[in-house]
From Swiss-Prot:
This is DNA primase small subunit PriS. CDD domains: AE_Prim_S. Its EC number is 2.7.7.-. Belongs to the eukaryotic-type primase small subunit family. One of its GO terms (molecular function) is metal ion binding. Its cofactor is Mg(2+); Mn(2+). Catalytic subunit of DNA primase, an RNA polymerase that catalyzes the synthesis of short RNA molecules used as primers for DNA polymerase during DNA replication. The small subunit contains the primase catalytic core and has DNA synthesis activity on its own. Binding to the large subunit stabilizes and modulates the activity, increasing the rate of DNA synthesis while decreasing the length of the DNA fragments, and conferring RNA synthesis capability. The DNA polymerase activity may enable DNA primase to also catalyze primer extension after primer synthesis. May also play a role in DNA repair. Keywords: DNA replication, DNA-directed RNA polymerase, Magnesium, Manganese, Metal-binding, Nucleotidyltransferase, Primosome, Transcription, Transferase. Heterodimer of a small subunit (PriS) and a large subunit (PriL). It comes from Picrophilus torridus (strain ATCC 700027 / DSM 9790 / JCM 10055 / NBRC 100828 / KAW 2/3).
């Protein structure tokens, strides 16, 4: 109960001291929130930013959301009565879809997810042609990032079209059979072009290639010494063109499948597909607090993303100059605000931002000091 009351009071302090970051056309968005007591409340609507900020000051949310969709009547309870007018294209990237994340620390998770965000941004900008102004990037306040595409090109897309985009980014249909068929078109951009270059790079290094063959590699490598159309097969595999896909043998297919798995590990982006396909999705409100960490949902300039550290930039100013006592059941280590904390089980005095993180993540509890 102490942790509940303190968290509520500190979140209330935050909302009294800070402004939310308003999405466009806020009057057309459905608003929802989870209070500190009770279940989610949704189908709310506000005419402008003053109304919603007044609301959150009176009703402190643990989590605050808004719809990626635009509606004529956003406060209607039944979806068909809201009258859908379009939706942003949303991508959610967090630890839930990262292999091995259950064995990572919080900081390791953030770094790993960041790699996938960079891959996603590369797809959106270089493959789909969205400009920087059309892409809104936010640290979620939790274990990842949200990417919003705000463009006339996406508003009217239905769930199936959004699923195709998601599959492209996750390389769901990127199989050797499909690659061989698509190579006839000789694409000049996209994953197939990159995969073709990747194959050429690997076949140009015998020791590197050896990693991708299961069996007698010397025998396989000798098979590449034969001539095809006046050229050695190994030379064709090394060339940066699509001719290689016309001459692959079964043994080559085994190698290419192994290379493809490695390629996907390095270049696909692990997104939460149901979020992308949902044209009515509620997403975290920019500038709100994440109820499990006390960190803010923070906008990130995509040109400065490489240097962005959420454990500095997403820490609210109002939590930086206060301290609290927390009790931990086990030792815990984390670096926040460029300070490394090595906490022992038992009572610890820590900065308020860390106390809210520890209690929100159920790592510790507030202690009432008299």
């Amino acid at each position: 109960m102490i942790s509940y009351d303190k968290s509520l009071n500190y979140f209330s302090l935050y909302y009294r001291s800070n402004h939310l970051i308003m999405p466009d056309l806020i009057s057309k968005r459905e608003i929802g929130y989870i209070p500190f007591s009770g279940t989610m409340i949704r189908h709310l609507s506000f005419r402008n930013h003053r109304e919603i900020e007044s609301f959150v000051k009176r009703n402190t949310p643990r989590h605050l959301y808004y719809s990626s969709a635009y509606y004529i009547k956003p406060d209607e309870k039944r979806m068909e009565k809201k009258i859908w007018e379009g939706a942003e294209l949303i991508f959610d990237l967090d630890a839930d879809h990262i292999p091995g994340s259950d064995k990572m620390t919080y900081e390791e998770i953030l770094l790993e997810v960041k790699k996938h965000v960079s891959r996603l941004l590369n797809y959106l900008i270089n493959d789909f042609g969205f400009d920087d102004d059309s892409i809104k990037l936010y640290f979620s306040g939790g274990r990842g990032y949200h990417v919003h595409v705000v463009s006339d090109r996406v508003y009217s897309l239905d769930s199936d079209a959004r699923r195709e985009i998601g599959n492209y980014i996750k390389m769901e249909d990127f199989t050797i059979d499909n690659i061989i068929r698509a190579s006839r078109e000789k694409p000049e951009s996209g994953p197939l072009k990159r995969f073709n270059e990747y194959i050429s790079e690997i076949y140009s290094d015998e020791n590197y290639l050896k990693r991708f063959y299961n069996g007698d590699f010397d025998r396989y490598y000798k098979s590449l010494d034969v001539y095809k159309d006046g050229k050695k097969k190994i030379d064709i595999m090394r060339e940066n063109n699509y001719e290689k896909f016309k001459i692959v043998s079964k043994r080559d297919l085994d190698v290419l499948n192994n290379i493809l798995n490695d390629f996907k590990d390095k270049y696909s982006a692990e997104i939460d597909e149901p979020v992308t396909t949902d044209v009515h999705r509620l997403i975290r409100f920019p500038g709100s607090l994440h109820g499990k960490t006390g960190l803010a949902v923070t906008p990130v300039n995509i040109n400065e993303f490489d240097n962005f550290d959420p454990l500095i930039s997403a820490v609210p100013e109002v939590f930086k100059d206060k301290y609290e006592h927390v009790y931990l059941n086990s030792d815990y280590m984390i670096t926040m605000m460029n300070e490394k904390f090595s906490l022992n089980a038992g009572e610890n005095k820590v900065p308020l931002y860390l106390a809210l993180f520890l209690t929100g993540m159920k790592i510790g509890n507030f202690i009432e000091k008299k």
